[in-house]
A protein has these predicted regions:
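Conserved metal-binding segment of the jelly-roll/cupin
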Residues: 61-74
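An amphipathic alpha-helical interaction segment
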Residues: 123-174
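A hydrophobic/aromatic-rich effector-binding and dimerization subdomain
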Residues: 2-19, 74-140
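Short loop segments at secondary-structure junctions
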Residues: 47-49, 72, 94
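Generic protein-terminus/edge-of-domain signal
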Residues: 1-62, 106, 117
Length: 174
């Protein structure tokens, strides 16, 4: 692993380790430098085209498509030209664990966290609806129209639905 490329920016807080980042780029090229972190990340292209590289594989994401970055995977995002509007959702996998050492933890979440399992990086538009729901929660959190407990419960439910969809569609691989 390239320790010098580890992102040192803290994501979330102790009380709420889930982070949402919204990047809207109007017409000029940009690139988020190659990096890795311990959190699980979902990258969702709300509109436009986004170049995404995950573990050396490059993709062009278009409107409604999502990508998954497993903990520890090198990745970068950018756009050469044009306008892109995208979100990244980051969280430690233990955030959605029930911490009971049950089958979900033992057979899925812990292997995803340790790299023994991963979710295919490109999940196309499979997660569009769930990502849009996460954006709704992000907006409610910003304008404080819901309690912090409500937004956290809603977020965890959607993230568990995301993991379930990836499992059911065969996107979880060794």
């Amino acid at each position: 692993m390239y320790f010098e490329l580890k992102e040192n920016k803290p994501h979330g807080t102790k009380d709420d380790p889930f982070s949402t980042y919204h990047i809207e780029n109007a017409g000029r090229s940009f690139q988020i430098p190659v990096h890795w972190h311990d959190e699980f990340e979902i990258i969702y292209v709300r509109s436009g085209f986004l170049t995404v590289s995950i573990s050396g594989e490059s993709y062009i994401g278009k409107t409604g498509e999502a990508f998954v970055v497993s903990p520890g995977n090198l990745h970068l995002m950018g756009a050469q030209t044009g306008t892109v509007d995208y979100y990244t959702f980051l969280f430690p996998l233990k955030y959605i664990s029930f911490r009971t050492d049950d089958m979900l933890d033992e057979k899925l979440l812990e292997p995803l966290n340790s790299g023994h399992l991963m979710i295919c990086p490109r999940v196309k538009d499979t997660a569009k609806e769930l990502c849009e729901q996460l954006i709704e929660i992000y907006e409610a959190k910003k304008d404080e129209s819901e309690s912090k407990i409500t937004t956290q419960v809603r977020t965890k439910i959607i993230l568990l639905q995301f993991i379930l969809e990836m499992w059911k569609k065969g996107f979880v691989i060794e």
